[in-house]
Amino acid sequence: MGISMKDIKELRSRTGAGVLDCKKALAETNGDIDAAVEYLREKGIAAAAKKAGRVAAEGAVNVYISDDRKKGVIVEVNSETDFVAKNDNFKDLVNKISEHLMQSDANSVDEVLKETWYQDSEKDVNTIIKEAIASIGENINLRRFEKYETNGFLQGYIHMGGKIGVLVDIDGEFNDSTRKVAKDIAMHIAAINPRYLSRDDISEEVINKEKEIYKEQMLNEGKPEHIIGQIVKGKMEKYYSEVCLLDQAFVRDEDITVGKLIEDNGLKINGFTRFELGEGIEKEEEDFAAEVMKEVNKK
């Protein structure tokens, strides 16, 4: 009998097994989904694949900064549900992973997972995460991180219990006044989500593309060619004010820009990282489609 994609999708949803494994299981059980579930369990495929194959798009973003504010890390660790993200054991794992990263020389997630765990020389980081998966009962994934070292000082901010995290590298004197300014800047980044620090960080290719788009818009609107250049210039200024942190109106006082606020307080921003929980993670529907296409392309 023919095996439908609908049945494969349902079996995959129930077991977490791959497309080809689900197709084979349905073929072996004449399309009986319940029997196919048992088949996969007997083969050990369902039990092994279910947790590791599920999409982990919840979790937490965490920021960890050394006492002297010279070193810091921002990290995203994913779980499957918001419920587990609020679990004390999960929170403890995220904090410990952050502490490990503060001591790590790794520059990628793959490198980190192979490292010896900072609290147990007989285990690697991957083993610690697998133990947490077994204990908590959900797939857990160390997704990404960024490490900072500075001659200035670092400022972090966590929004909504770990839904958004920001880490900012700042040059200047650290005191009560500049600490408040730095925190306000971090909160601004969390709220407004600038794509760049300054205009200098935008590639010439991107700038030229934006200019071309605006020029085409003006031509399509019938604007005289001799004034289009000036109009495009004005639109580019607006573009910079939307995507560049230093050009943006400060969220707490829109009469000044972030750049002016920094300058007035004798500070300089060297860089920043903003993580939003789950951004860019494909959900299950898209994941299934991608896997099907992958198998089709193997033919």
From Swiss-Prot:
| An annotated GO cellular component | cytoplasm
| Compartments reported by the entry | Cytoplasm
The identity of this protein, by name, is Elongation factor Ts
- Extract the Pfam families matched here: EF_TS
Q: Where is this region: Involved in Mg(2+) ion dislocation from EF-Tu?
A: 81-84
Give the highest taxon in the source lineage. Answer: Bacteria
Give coiled-coil spans as residue ranges: none
The entry assigns this protein to a family as follows: Belongs to the EF-Ts family.
NCBIfam families, sorted: tsf (TIGR00116)
What is the documented function of this protein?
Answer: Associates with the EF-Tu.GDP complex and induces the exchange of GDP to GTP. It remains bound to the aminoacyl-tRNA.EF-Tu.GTP complex up to the GTP hydrolysis stage on the ribosome.
- Molecular functions per Gene Ontology: translation elongation factor activity
What keywords are assigned to this protein?
Answer: Cytoplasm, Elongation factor, Protein biosynthesis
The organism of origin for this protein: Halothermothrix orenii (strain H 168 / OCM 544 / DSM 9562)
